[in-house]
Design a protein with these regions (language model features):
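Noncatalytic, solvent-exposed loop/strand surfaces
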Residues: 1-183
């Protein structure tokens, strides 16, 4: 669908919608707004739009929980709210949030990453919010916060993270279907 936006910066990873999608060029509180929804917690991820669903990450910093939300694209109704992790939030820049990574969706599953407890946590979920697989990459220290969104390429989910702890980082690929490490 030309109007789908399956990952951060859109279908071509350049922030440009297809001309045939005819996105609105102007909007305000009363113009070109289909629906609005309260988002529990705080997050800086971009909405991901695939088919009849909109996905978004959020974090409740008081309860120290991280969630993936799924909305009905037409109505804005919350279809599900999946708590992914709870507890052990680390240092973060106060201008960042613990839900800055955007969801990536291939139409079959959704993928996202969070940072907490000195770990990068990456998950795959079904379109109904059921956990398919999870990866935990330990030994990370945040300088300004974490915000890298998973990149989908062929059968891979590619993950990247910088690391204040040792000056190194992470660049890895896992299989979309089963989460097995590819490189």
């Amino acid at each position: 669908d030309d109007t789908d936006w399956g990952w951060w910066r859109g279908p071509n990873h350049n922030g440009i919608a297809a001309a045939s999608a005819q996105p609105p060029l102007t909007w305000d509180d009363n113009t070109n707004i289909r629906w609005q929804a309260e988002i529990p917690g705080r997050g800086h991820s971009s909405p991901t739009v695939v088919g009849d669903r909109v996905f978004l990450t959020t974090a409740n910093e008081v309860k120290q929980t991280q969630h993936v939300l799924c909305f009905d694209r037409s109505t804005g109704d919350v279809l599900w709210n999946k708590e992914i992790y709870q507890g052990n939030f680390d240092h973060n820049n106060n201008k960042n949030s613990f839900a800055s990574s955007s969801v990536s969706c291939d139409g079959q599953q959704i993928y996202t990453s969070f940072f907490r407890d000195k770990k990068i946590l990456t998950v795959a979920l079904t379109l109904k919010g059921k956990l398919v697989w999870e990866h935990v990459y330990g030994g990370f220290a945040s300088h300004q916060g974490f915000g890298a969104s998973p990149l989908l390429y062929k059968r891979m989910v590619i993950l990247a993270a910088d690391n204040k702890a040792d000056g190194g980082g992470l660049l890895t690929a896992v299989d979309r279907q089963n989460g097995e490490s590819l490189w």
